[in-house]
Amino acid sequence: MEMASAFTLNVRLDNIAIITIDVPGEKMNTLKAEFASQVRAIIKQIRENKELRGVVFVSAKPDNFIAGADINMIGNCKTAQEAEVLARQGQQLMAEIHALPIPVIAAIHGACLGGGLELALACHGRVCTDDPKTVLGLPEVQLGLLPGSGGTQRLPRLIGVSTALEMILTGKQLRAKQAVKLGLVDDVVPHSILLEAAVELAKQDRPSSRPLPVRERILAGPLGRALLFKMVGKKTEHKTQGNYPATERILEVVETGLAQGTSSGYDAEARAFGELAMTPQSQALRNIFFASTDVKKDPGSDAPPAPLNSVGILGGGLMGGGIAYVTACKAGLPVRIKDINPRGINHALKYSWDQLEGKVRRRHLKASERDKQLALISGTTDYCGFAHRDLIIEAVFENLELKQQMVAEVEQNCATHTIFASNTSSLPIGDIAAHAARPEQVIGLHFFSPVEKMPLVEIIPHASTSAQTIATTVKLAKKQGKTPIVVRDKAGFYVNRILAPYINEAIRMLTEGERIEHIDAALVKFGFPVGPIQLLDEVGIDTGTKIMPVLEAAYGERFSAPANVVSSILNDDRKGRKNGRGFYLYGQKGCKSKKQVDPAIYPLIGAQGQGRLSAPQVAERCVMLMLNEAVRCLDEQVIRSVRDGDIGAVFGIGFPPFLGGPFRYIDSLGAGEVVAIMQRLATQYGSRFTPCDRLVEMSERGESFWKTTATDLQ
């Protein structure tokens, strides 16, 4: 049976050809290799029809133009040469579109990303809608790749090299107003008149390129170019720590095109695309993409979720305010906040106001839309308005008796179907539900701070939690824009459990004489966004260390922190950034000076700060403990799969994405190598480095956690 075409041609009475993009059976339009013949057949028809005045590409999907190329095409390539051929085929197709003798216009609504933007760049003009769904970008770098269908050559010539480099190197997505300001699109119109606006543009002569600003023209010349690429290269190296080869190749390819012409540029682009597709970094990043997509499709349980019409939140503090924001402004659900103090309610309301007002200032949101979203949030000091809430999220202090009291109050003041979700980071959910009348409706819903930025949530059912409660909570998390993983109700859950030994080891090295900045720099060089000591300062030393005694009580000596170090720091009223006193010095608000270690910290904990370990040795000690604990979590069924373990670590604590997560990283090293490293470290530093039984068994059998495919498990 012949597959329905993703590209169809219709000619209007005014002799404008409309090419409609609609990939059959898919929510999103993505470009596949087999579509090339369909497009070429349409191009042939257009060339043969001498009466045509112009061409318009438009999508039939309600919220996307083209979301990019099908990533599976890259995974199917076995060699760099095969991936290079794929890129050259894309380049050739775009060149054929651009070579049409009549104006070709892209009518863009919704996501126009990757290969979709490259197709739009191959057109002679672009019109997009003013809808918030409309975004344009080249996010290939986030998959360890570069744009392979001409994007590295066309974009710098259209909007200027410095602006293009920023887009390509970061994967930054532009909204409509930004795109028209930079010259990426020719016009921005309401969705209702998109097609007509594009048709009118197609009836004119080919749109002439807008002259680049003087600055961009200078930067494209030999002298300006040399300075620009040196500066951008240095900045990029500092940001990536040399862990992402795609950024270096992007700079090389763009510069080649500007210095030697487009022919050399296209050649360099295709070659670099092929080579990058085979790098372990790209393979790991693509695996993370597939795994996160898979997690987002996972309903959490087989039961159907209950309806979600409104949510209540207990506590208007930092976490409560953040949860209220994502519930109202991302999920679009009415939120009622209860706090015993009106100031708590005001704090939560101001939290959402600050987030939304920032969007208004950046022109990402209209003031009227801000007011509409804020109207979804209300507050109370009692349970007025809570009677019919479908789900209550508790975000009060980490105190078991208090949380048990909250369960009792919710059961007394809310409907019998109301779910109670605790945002605890350390207390067992089973204990919180111990006296509940309806324990099947009690569950953990652990957000990470800052709530609006951190993508992960842990969903923690206890032994009596119902399947429907799990499914409903997963549904809410997804509506809030989060990536949820379901974890077992054991001390520390998953993320904090694997994070604690990592931070403990950093503190232990600090007491042994390693410098704070050396420890942090070593882990940043390894690939973490911040080092473990700085992370402790950022989350709050009191908050970050509160869970350590809980974990030590549950799992024993391997979770013990260096004696008296944490208490010495806390007794000196050091809580980190939040009170301006931590491991680092904090100047006045708004001060942009380079962060500096507080030298008073060393005598406080009886350390010298001399240091003798290399950066790789520092990173090895912290990371190996994290890997070992992640495997234990899998063995104890704290996580349901290695997929969840990798996603939880990458999205929850910033485990280096280019390594693919703890389990992908173990596979890349080999279980045997990991066991050998840990046995060496155990001999040097103690039994906490003893590899767990599962790792030893896998080492002996030569097993790995993942199969070679992106989503299958052993």
From Swiss-Prot:
GO terms for biological process: fatty acid beta-oxidation. It is found in: Cytoplasm. Its main location: cytoplasm. Residues 306-714 are annotated as: 3-hydroxyacyl-CoA dehydrogenase. One of its GO terms (molecular function) is NAD+ binding. It catalyses: a (3S)-3-hydroxyacyl-CoA = a (2E)-enoyl-CoA + H2O; a 4-saturated-(3S)-3-hydroxyacyl-CoA = a (3E)-enoyl-CoA + H2O; a (3S)-3-hydroxyacyl-CoA + NAD(+) = a 3-oxoacyl-CoA + NADH + H(+); (3S)-3-hydroxybutanoyl-CoA = (3R)-3-hydroxybutanoyl-CoA. Residues 1-190 are annotated as: Enoyl-CoA hydratase. Keywords: Cytoplasm, Fatty acid metabolism, Isomerase, Lipid degradation, Lipid metabolism, Lyase, Multifunctional enzyme, NAD, Oxidoreductase. The record marks E118, E140 as: Important for catalytic activity. It comes from the Bacteria. Gene3D superfamilies: 1.10.1040.50, 2-enoyl-CoA Hydratase, Chain A, domain 1, NAD(P)-binding Rossmann-like Domain. Its EC number is 4.2.1.17, 5.1.2.3, 1.1.1.35. One of its GO terms (cellular component) is cytoplasm. The keyword Hydrolase does not apply. PROSITE patterns: 3HCDH. Pathway: Lipid metabolism; fatty acid beta-oxidation. In the N-terminal section; belongs to the enoyl-CoA hydratase/isomerase family. Heterotetramer of two alpha chains (FadJ) and two beta chains (FadI). HAMAP family: FadJ (MF_01617). Catalyzes the formation of a hydroxyacyl-CoA by addition of water on enoyl-CoA. Also exhibits 3-hydroxyacyl-CoA epimerase and 3-hydroxyacyl-CoA dehydrogenase activities. This is Fatty acid oxidation complex subunit alpha. It comes from Escherichia coli O45:K1 (strain S88 / ExPEC). The gene is fadJ.
